[in-house]
A protein has these predicted regions:
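Charge-patterned, long linear interaction tracts outside catalytic cores
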Residues: 129-155
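Polybasic low-complexity intrinsically disordered regions
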Residues: 1-77
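Catalytic-loop motifs flanking and including active-site residues across diverse enzymes
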Residues: 43, 109, 113, 139, ...
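Helix-centered, glycine/charged polyanion-binding patches within enzymatic domains
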Residues: 59, 64-132
Length: 155
């Protein structure tokens, strides 16, 4: 797919994208593989349903790309509190309450997990083709990341 970025340049991509849901300690809970052209917010509901089957959590913390009424309602239907950064579409940005802002800052753990998966566990250099092979390659990285995070928790 191709789109224009904020500076007006065309940005292209091909292949696949891994959507990862992590616990607040950085351990991956659920993963979905999608086409690289699919917007992140379209994977949020299926990913949250998989996570809800595996763990019990209170908060769903997401960045501004996931700001939609449907996603807020879905989070509430699962009994979760949605902490989704507001995307100010032709309006003002809504700020979090102080306690929610502290909880929202925990999102850096998920960003760190994604970065570690790319940098340390091979997700940045996938040299296989086909969805099944790509998913297998990435799942070995997710497995290694999970084991590493669990070992760090023991220390």
């Amino acid at each position: 797919g191709t789109k224009c970025n904020a500076q007006g340049y065309k940005v292209s991509w091909n292949g696949y994208k891994l959507h990862l849901d992590t616990a607040d300690c950085g351990v991956p809970i659920a993963a979905l593989l999608s086409s690289a052209s699919m917007h992140d917010s379209r994977a949020a509901i299926p990913l949250s349903l998989i996570s809800a089957q595996r763990v019990t959590n209170l908060y769903d913390v997401m960045d501004a790309a996931y700001c939609s009424f449907e996603l807020h309602e879905h989070c509430r239907s699962l009994g979760h509190v949605p902490l989704i950064d507001h995307n100010p579409r032709k309006g003002e940005k809504e700020a979090f309450e102080p306690a929610d802002a502290v909880r929202y800052n925990e999102r850096t753990v998920a960003e760190r997990s994604n970065a570690r998966l790319k940098d340390e566990f091979g997700a940045n250099n996938v040299r296989v083709q086909g969805g099944t092979k790509v998913m297998g390659h990435l799942m070995f990285g997710v497995l290694a990341l999970s084991a590493d995070q669990l070992m760090r928790l023991r220390q």
